[in-house]
């Protein structure tokens, strides 16, 4: 897969990035190099390799999930201009 100049312009437009015509060839080369690297990664045989979440072995600390109300709902909505119960009231935006 390769990226052409029109695709670079489209990506820049979608990302809302100003790209001059002089920058397009450079960015095209950069994007093509990235895609070539990703294609190399897809060719690596990872059969039998255990999935990793980190390069260093570690165990995540686990705790019991406890549901509570935080006991500060009144404090949270105290400065809101309009509330109902423990909910913020906001102006209607869509009819």
UniProtKB/Swiss-Prot annotation:
Gene3D superfamilies cross-referenced by the UniProt entry: Glu-tRNAGln amidotransferase C subunit, N-terminal domain
Listed transmembrane segments: none
Source species, domain of life: Bacteria
Catalytic activity: L-glutamyl-tRNA(Gln) + L-glutamine + ATP + H2O = L-glutaminyl-tRNA(Gln) + L-glutamate + ADP + phosphate + H(+); L-aspartyl-tRNA(Asn) + L-glutamine + ATP + H2O = L-asparaginyl-tRNA(Asn) + L-glutamate + ADP + phosphate + 2 H(+)
Entries under InterPro entries matching the protein: Asp/Glu-ADT_sf_sub_c, GatC
GO function term, MF aspect, one: ATP binding
Keywords: ATP-binding, Ligase, Nucleotide-binding, Protein biosynthesis
Xref: SUPFAM superfamilies: Glu-tRNAGln amidotransferase C subunit
Gene Ontology biological process terms from the UniProt entry: glutaminyl-tRNAGln biosynthesis via transamidation; regulation of translational fidelity; translation
EC number: 6.3.5.-
Family annotation (HAMAP family): GatC
NCBIfam families xrefs: gatC
Family: Belongs to the GatC family.
Main function: Allows the formation of correctly charged Asn-tRNA(Asn) or Gln-tRNA(Gln) through the transamidation of misacylated Asp-tRNA(Asn) or Glu-tRNA(Gln) in organisms which lack either or both of asparaginyl-tRNA or glutaminyl-tRNA synthetases. The reaction takes place in the presence of glutamine and ATP through an activated phospho-Asp-tRNA(Asn) or phospho-Glu-tRNA(Gln).
Subunit structure comment from the entry: Heterotrimer of A, B and C subunits.
Protein's UniProt name: Aspartyl/glutamyl-tRNA(Asn/Gln) amidotransferase subunit C
Organism: Bradyrhizobium diazoefficiens (strain JCM 10833 / BCRC 13528 / IAM 13628 / NBRC 14792 / USDA 110)
Gene (UniProt): gatC
């Amino acid at each position: 897969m390769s990226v052409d100049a029109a695709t670079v312009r489209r990506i820049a437009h979608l990302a809302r990035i100003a790209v001059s015509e002089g920058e397009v060839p450079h960015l095209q080369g950069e994007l093509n190099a990235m895609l070539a690297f990703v294609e190399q990664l897809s060719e690596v045989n990872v059969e039998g390799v255990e999935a990793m979440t980190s390069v260093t072995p570690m165990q995540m600390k686990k705790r019991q999930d406890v549901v509570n109300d935080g006991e500060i709902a009144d404090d949270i909505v105290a400065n809101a201009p309009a509330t109902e119960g423990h909910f913020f009231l906001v102006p209607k935006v869509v009819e």
